[in-house]
């Protein structure tokens, strides 16, 4: 998972030392959400992890709303790059 995190940060960073911009945070959360989606297909009764999963989805939604409000160009390009619905 840490290797994937580094590659995601490298793909979505805004500047050379970027690790915490909204774009990077959304990309990292999306990667973790996709991983957990596959996990829940294998283990449908893992309810404890599902709580954290739903929190991650809510956090990503808040970050997407923030990005949409303050930087629409970045929001639209990020949605396309991550294949998310609007």
Curated annotation (Swiss-Prot):
Residues making up the signal peptide according to the UniProt record: none
Domain of life: Bacteria
GO biological process: translation
One Pfam family of this chain: Ribosomal_S15
Matches recorded under InterPro entries: Ribosomal_uS15, Ribosomal_uS15_bac-type, uS15_NS1_RNA-bd_sf
Alphabetically ordered keywords of this record: Ribonucleoprotein, Ribosomal protein, RNA-binding, rRNA-binding
Gene Ontology molecular functions: rRNA binding; structural constituent of ribosome
One Gene Ontology term, aspect cellular component: cytosolic small ribosomal subunit
Function (record text): One of the primary rRNA binding proteins, it binds directly to 16S rRNA where it helps nucleate assembly of the platform of the 30S subunit by binding and bridging several RNA helices of the 16S rRNA.
Family: Belongs to the universal ribosomal protein uS15 family.
Quaternary assembly: Part of the 30S ribosomal subunit. Forms a bridge to the 50S subunit in the 70S ribosome, contacting the 23S rRNA.
Name by which UniProt lists this protein: Small ribosomal subunit protein uS15
Organism: Endomicrobium trichonymphae
Chain's gene name: rpsO
């Amino acid at each position: 998972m840490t290797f994937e995190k580094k590659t995601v940060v490298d793909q979505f960073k805004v500047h050379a030392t970027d690790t915490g911009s909204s774009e990077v945070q959304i990309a990292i959360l999306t990667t973790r959400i996709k991983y957990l989606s596959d996990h829940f297909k294998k283990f449908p009764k893992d309810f404890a992890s599902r709580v954290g999963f739903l929190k991650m989805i809510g956090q990503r939604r808040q970050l997407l709303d923030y990005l949409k409000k303050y930087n629409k160009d970045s929001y639209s390009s990020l949605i396309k790059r991550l294949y998310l619905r609007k």
